[in-house]
């Protein structure tokens, strides 16, 4: 195997050449084959891959909640019951994805490194708008793969330190970015989740209320969309729920979400019509 440091034990020139503070730009110069969208040229559309499904985000005074179901599907089969589709992006933001699971996970990892790399190089963090724009550029880079069936779209949310508010950004496969002021959902169950959120959202939601309606929206999506997984009480698999406020990012523990799920199931048992 060739020595990556070379005969003299030095790093290759690409590592020493001044460039931008973007890790994705550096990767495109030094190892472009490692970028998520670099593997185009497939013989045809790809279908037999796992897909992540429904993510929701809800803004409330003082922050934002993001929640995702745990199911990944492959065709008509359940590929995984405990997949995690909501992730920490940096100290004041989170990101989730819907679509091809492998590409989505790779995109999230690259985005996390991108934000960390910028902070280390520049000694400061990107603004929330700049983070959203960096993510849009990565989504655009995956367009060739998306056109061959390996599509993934993220949902990005965070706490804006400049305005003191939680903000939500959604994307399409061509990287068009939209800011949602109240709530948003992506994935196969999003139409049902949005309908649920539309009925329950209020501008004065508390953090606990925002968690409740987010989990309830996923419950409603799972009720009508077979690709969205509902809470699995037997296996103790509950939605991944994260909050971002002025105190930063925090993921809720399962034992915090369990009573929320229990309360929803109890309420639904007395109102079987939903």
UniProtKB/Swiss-Prot annotation:
Residues 1-52 form a propeptide. It catalyses: Cleavage of peptide bonds with very broad specificity. Component of the proteasome core, a large protease complex with broad specificity involved in protein degradation. This is Proteasome subunit beta. The 20S proteasome core is composed of 14 alpha and 14 beta subunits that assemble into four stacked heptameric rings, resulting in a barrel-shaped structure. The two inner rings, each composed of seven catalytic beta subunits, are sandwiched by two outer rings, each composed of seven alpha subunits. The catalytic chamber with the active sites is on the inside of the barrel. Has a gated structure, the ends of the cylinder being occluded by the N-termini of the alpha-subunits. Is capped by the proteasome-associated ATPase, ARC. It comes from Frankia casuarinae (strain DSM 45818 / CECT 9043 / HFP020203 / CcI3). The active site is at 53 (nucleophile). Pathway: Protein degradation; proteasomal Pup-dependent pathway.
């Amino acid at each position: 195997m060739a020595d990556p440091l070379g005969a003299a034990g030095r790093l290759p020139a690409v590592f020493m050449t001044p460039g931008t503070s973007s890790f994705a730009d550096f990767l495109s110069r030094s190892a472009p084959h490692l970028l998520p969208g670099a593997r185009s040229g497939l013989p045809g559309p790809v279908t037999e891959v796992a897909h992540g499904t429904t993510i929701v985000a809800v803004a409330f005074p003082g922050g934002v909640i993001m929640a995702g179901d745990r199911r990944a599907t492959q065709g008509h089969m359940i590929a995984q019951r405990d997949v995690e589709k909501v992730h920490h992006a940096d100290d004041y933001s989170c990101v989730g994805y819907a679509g091809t699971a492998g590409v989505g996970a790779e995109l999230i990892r690259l985005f996390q490194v991108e934000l960390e790399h910028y902070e280390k190089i520049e000694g400061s963090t990107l603004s929330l708008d700049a983070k959203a724009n960096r993510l849009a550029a990565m989504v655009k880079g995956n367009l060739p793969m998306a056109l061959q069936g390996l599509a993934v779209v993220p949902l990005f949310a965070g706490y804006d330190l400049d305005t003191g508010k939680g903000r939500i950004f959604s994307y399409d496969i061509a990287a068009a970015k939209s800011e949602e002021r109240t709530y948003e959902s992506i994935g196969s169950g999003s139409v049902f989740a949005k309908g649920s959120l539309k009925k329950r959202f209020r501008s004065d939601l508390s953090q606990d209320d925002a968690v409740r309606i987010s989990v309830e929206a996923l419950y409603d999506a799972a009720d009508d969309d077979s690709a969205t997984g509902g809470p699995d009480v037997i296996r103790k698999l509950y939605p991944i729920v994260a909050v971002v406020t002025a105190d930063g990012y925090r993921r809720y523990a399962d034992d915090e979400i369990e009573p929320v799920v229990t309360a929803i199931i109890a309420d639904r048992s007395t109102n079987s019509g939903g």
